[in-house]
Amino acid sequence: MKYVLSLHQNSRRGVILFATGLIILWGSAAMAMALRSPAFKQNGHIPSKFTCEGEDVSPPLAWEGVPNGAKSLVLIIDDPDAPDPKAPKMVWVHWVVYNIPPATKSFPENAGKAGLPRGTVLGLNDFKKTEYGGPCPPIGRHRYFHKLYALDDTLDLRSGTKSQIERAMQGHVLANTELIGTYQKGDR
């Protein structure tokens, strides 16, 4: 009887440990960061309003699942297909935004300087500006990666470039997510 009781207790303990593990795993999956836009879907067409052929304003973006312990967020939008998607030679940076307060959940359309939360810093893009520069592909359909990072620190940089920010982020990324949109000149 003692053997059966011991086996029963061990089984119960195993079930409890298994259930606890499932709760931890399920909780982690539920907390994954996600980035979305009401203007376009993942791998979808970016409306011309947000490009050089339209108003050239930043699209609305919303995110969730920023991990506890995050001290800042970084948003980078770039195009890995420049200048020609059949023979890409460079990654073109369209927008760099960092030191976004972690409680921030979204950017409105045309966030610009006035629509960004206090403390947020705009970095230098490849247009040599500290503002959003929309898609304007010279050849073919390009992909535009909207990458959001949660960091365990803030970045001590003034109008940093993408490469400076990526170096400063090393070892500080808690989580990241991305949203990809596409655009080709003439699309509406």
Which residues are covered by each model-predicted region?
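Domain-scale selection of a single, long terminal region
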Residues: K2, S28-A29
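Bacterial N-terminal signal peptides
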Residues: I16-G27
